[in-house]
Amino acid sequence: MPATDPGQPRARSPRWRGWLVNIGLALLILGGVQWWQARPLAKGEAPPLAGLDQTGAWVELRDLRGEPVLVHFWASWCPVCRAMDGFVDAIARDHRVLTVALQSGEAGEILSYLQAADLDFPVVPDPNGAIARRWGVGGVPASFVIDPEGRIASATVGLSTEPGLRLRLWAAKGGEAPRQ
């Protein structure tokens, strides 16, 4: 063991090392929370999802097979969902998207909300939470990416970013360039 001189100042660890440890711990905690919240979500084959959308047209998830689909559960009263509305709307312009409005009223109320927010994506109302229960959704927002064969490729609860959702859709397609 080397002798140390008590008069010699101790070498300090660089400050960045402490920051890295703290950032690593924060990411680990956030990842753990995300995993914990996603545990009850549906896995494997996507559960059935069908109903009248906000315009009165019949929509069915199985009719969207062949391309990846974003299935997004949201609520008009949820602030995080409102923060994601623009992401979902932008993604709906070049990907298949089907959303479910959880306990947000009937089709007319949802249509009014969409029009006021200048949003244009298909919405199936779920006033009593029956669809959400089939999918294991206990809180919103919840986002599922369905692969072209109808299997759940990824599922998350909470805030997701537009690039993150687009990346999941791209991966579900097998990493091919998005259609134009």
Where are these regions (language model features)?
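Short active-site neighborhood of thiol/selenol oxidoreductases, capturing the structured segment around
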Residues: 60-82, 88
